[in-house]
From Swiss-Prot:
Gene name per UniProt: thrS
Protein's name in the database: Threonine--tRNA ligase
GO BP, sorted A to Z: threonyl-tRNA aminoacylation
Cofactor(s) needed for function: Zn(2+)
Native species: Parabacteroides distasonis (strain ATCC 8503 / DSM 20701 / CIP 104284 / JCM 5825 / NCTC 11152)
PROSITE patterns in the record: AA_TRNA_LIGASE_II (PS50862), TGS (PS51880)
Transmembrane domains' residue ranges: none
Cofactor descriptive note: Binds 1 zinc ion per subunit.
Pfam families per UniProt: HGTP_anticodon, TGS, tRNA-synt_2b, tRNA_SAD
Length: 651
């Protein structure tokens, strides 16, 4: 008999070789219908795989991320099987599950797969679902795998196999389709009741622009059709909120192929928005004694060799800048941290000087393949709201608490009320790859866990997910339509202090290494603005929006009165513009609603005679007529209320 421990710490005994499906059936028939895969000692398994030793088991359902992953991984195989039947001779690359659905990279040869073919592919997938094909795992030798896929002319698969270590290789088979795969997978195809092919795109094999461009098909599946319908409705809403579309409508930013792909340019309104965000963060950081610094946009190659960034980014970075006189090489800055390490090193440091908190809105450049570029969320030049804290090991917990406060203030002020966190710690067993002493790691890991507990923050702990140089805490927010975005990171670093030989003199008069903490509440200004646009659909908080008021005269003869109002509001620090185009008032209202301006003031003969304005509020319509001073007090009162909420959350 073997002992199975469940997440609630209850224990049951089963015969050796019992499968996770049999365990589910022993608990309830409903659970057996809902379970998709199982976590066995932290590793996700197929439900049919025998468990031969005592184990900790969690039965995974749709609600679990690992359950969805297995579901969508099996869906990728289902789509591949359908493609194999529809396009004889098609060759397969890779087909992983992703955050929302799955994709498969395929080489259809002379055939062309286009959007008009999606319905036929979906129909074939549902035909295979109805067959309830069993998904079978098989362990074979590397030689057998090479022969199997080689005989089929699967050149992409044989390339992958050739790079694997000698030993057992896993394949999965359903119907006539067999794939090289680690798994896990569902028991059979009948689980995949609702299918949808979403899009088709090009993708270079293994992300290498010098290799062949394959066809990438994206899809998504659900256990129920109702869930698919809800998702497709969500997709339509997401299209309306696309930051690229709204950013263009609101004149926030632009791109130009003449300037260069992936290089955003901020227009006046977008710049005003961005600067206001930066000032907001500066005000918060000032309370926590951050000192702002400014560093050059390039650095000597030797700096990045020392930091290790040259090894990571050098090969794929932009071309170096050569100085003919000195014969030196300079690179566009990929990270701010090496420069901050040199600032720390500029002066002798005592334990009394720590923590030292250096902040910078630093622009960095990293090469991204053109196919990976996407609006503001994936660019080649971006500005990080970066800060690096140099502290003693005993100060790590308090610094985490402080940064968590800052991130919480940012999220609440921007109305990201729904967020979660993940703690990434060392692997429980394999610890050779981590730099730094066990003692310091244990202190840092304990400090992060305790900080989350003190703040009442429910954080998921992931062992083995820490970087080799330190544990970290990541924050994920849910936007207004339920999508998850990773925003805000706090990362402990034992690597750079070692590489740069950073020191401080301790109370014992001996030299010690400081702990370095990286943090960025926004992540990058570009990505944060993109997420904020899609979260708010461009309807920013009143204090933040670039233009708070648009004054619209109903005819040219009231233009002077409109500009007089704009000046009066400007004197009270209200951001107002005048739309004095020779257009009908209905057209002006529609155009400015598209620009998401919170308030519109309509002025005509009646308003001019009474020194009033007719007020319309975005999303609420007509608010009636009022004196200019009354309106100004109303607007400033709204802003003050928002700022008071921020102030309370900061106290």
């Amino acid at each position: 008999m073997i002992k199975i421990t469940f997440p609630d710490n209850s224990v049951r005994e089963y015969a050796k070789g019992t499968t996770a499906m049999q365990i589910a059936e022993s608990i309830s028939s409903r659970l057996a219908q809902e379970v998709l895969a199982a976590s066995v000692n932290g590793e996700v398994w197929d439900l049919s795989r025998p468990i031969n030793d005592d184990a900790t088991v969690k039965l995974l359902k749709w609600e679990d991320e690992e359950g969805k992953h297995a579901f969508w991984h099996s869906s990728a195989h289902l789509m591949a099987e359908a493609l194999q039947e529809l396009y004889p001779g098609i060759k397969f690359g890779i087909g992983p599950a992703i955050e929302n659905g799955f994709y498969y990279d395929v080489d259809p040869g002379e055939a062309v797969i286009k959007e008009g073919d999606f319905a036929a592919i979906e129909a074939k997938m549902l035909e295979l679902v109805a067959k309830k094909e069993e998904i079978k795992r098989q362990d074979i030798t590397k030689a057998d795998a090479m022969k199997m896929f080689g005989d089929r002319g699967e050149e992409y698969k044989t390339e992958l196999i050739s790079e694997l270590e000698d030993g057992t290789i896993t394949t999965y088979t359903q119907g006539s389709f067999t794939d090289l795969c680690r798994g896990p997978h569902l028991p059979n195809t009948s689980y995949l009741k609702a299918v949808k092919i979403l899009s088709v795109a090009g993708a270079y094999w293994r992300g290498d622009e010098k290799r062949k461009q394959l066809v990438r098909l994206y899809g998504i599946t659900f256990p129920k059709k109702k869930m698919l319908d809800e998702y497709l409705t969500l997709l339509e809403e997401a299209k309306k909120r696309d930051h690229r579309k709204i950013g263009k409508e609101m004149d926030l930013f632009m791109f130009s192929d003449t300037v260069g792909k992936g290089l955003p340019m901020w227009l006046p309104k977008g710049t005003a928005l961005r600067l206001r965000l930066q000032e907001f963060l500066r005000r918060i950081q000032a309370r926590y004694n951050y000192q702002e610094v400014m560093c050059p946009p390039i650095g000597n190659k030797l700096l990045y060799i020392t930091s290790g960034h040259y090894a990571k980014y050098g090969k794929d970075s932009f071309q170096p800048i050569h100085t003919p006189e000195e014969g030196e090489e300079y690179f566009l800055k990929p990270m701010n941290c090496p420069h901050h390490c040199m600032i720390y090193k500029n002066s002798p440091r005592s334990y009394k000087d720590l923590p030292l908190r250096l902040a910078e809105f630093g622009t960095v450049c990293r090469y991204e393949q053109s196919g990976e570029l996407h609006g503001l969320t994936r660019v080649r030049s971006f500005t990080q709201d970066d800060a690096h804290i140099f502290c003693r090991p005993d100060q790590v917990k308090q610094e985490f608490l402080n940064v968590m406060d800052i991130i919480s203030i940012v999220f609440k002020t921007m109305n990201f009320e729904n967020f979660e966190a993940q703690i990434s710690l060392r692997d429980k067993v394999n610890r050779e790859k981590y730099i730094g002493s066990d003692e310091n790691w244990e202190k840092a890991e304990q400090a992060i866990v305790e900080a989350c507990e003190e703040k009442g923050l429910k954080a998921k702990i992931e062992y083995g997910e820490a970087a080799f140089y330190g544990p970290k805490l990541d924050f994920m927010v849910k936007d207004a339509i339920g999508r998850r975005w990773q925003l805000g990171t706090i990362q402990v670093d034992y690597n750079l202090p070692e590489r740069f030989q950073l020191e401080y003199t301790g109370a014992d008069n001996q030299k010690h290494r400081p702990v370095m903490i990286h943090r960025a509440p926004f992540g990058s200004m570009e990505r944060f603005v993109a997420v904020l646009i899609e979260h708010t659909a461009g309807k920013f908080p009143l204090w933040l929006t670039p233009e708070q008021v648009c004054i619209m005269p109903i005819s040219e003869k009231f233009n002077d009165y409109a500009w007089q109002i704009a000046r009066e509001l400007g004197n009270q620090e209200i951001r107002a513009i005048v739309d004095d185009r020779n257009e009908k008032i209905g057209r002006k209202i529609r155009d400015n609603e598209l620009k998401r301006i919170p308030y519109m003031l309509i002025v005509g003969e009646k308003e001019a005679e009474n020194s009033e304005v007719s007020v319309r509020k975005q999303g609420e319509g007509d608010k009636g007529s009022m004196k200019i001073a009354t309106f100004a007090a109303l607007l400033n009162g709204e802003v003050e209320e928002m700022m008071n909420r921020w102030q309370k959350s900061n106290d």
